[in-house]
Amino acid sequence: MVSIEYKEADNNLNFTFNGHLDTNTSTWINESIIKELNNRKGSDNPEEKADFKVTFDLLDVSYISSYFIRICILTAKQVKPGNFRIINCDPMIKKTFKIAGLDESLNVS
């Protein structure tokens, strides 16, 4: 089973995921993230950069699909440069971001 939790703290919006983030589950995850970002920004204009920080916590994630990587890229584009990060990656997931050349631009740790 896949789940996603949202927490707001100060100027941070934290998303905690768990499970197997394959293409099927990533569809509703994407919709949930977009909804939450738009609510927080007060706008659904993708060109408008959010002023808050976004963190994806992948501590309990066992797999990510290319669709989830796309979600990470699109979310990072919704906030100002440096305001997106991915934390608590499994070593194999971190390697996936590194192979894709996204580990630094998405602040993967």
Q: Positions of the model-derived regions?
A:
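Short beta-strand/loop segment at the start of cytosolic alpha/beta domains
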Residues: 1-16
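Amphipathic alpha-helical interaction surfaces in cytosolic regulatory modules
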Residues: 21-105
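Short acidic-hydrophobic, aromatic-tinged amphipathic segments that line or gate anion-handling sites
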Residues: 107-109
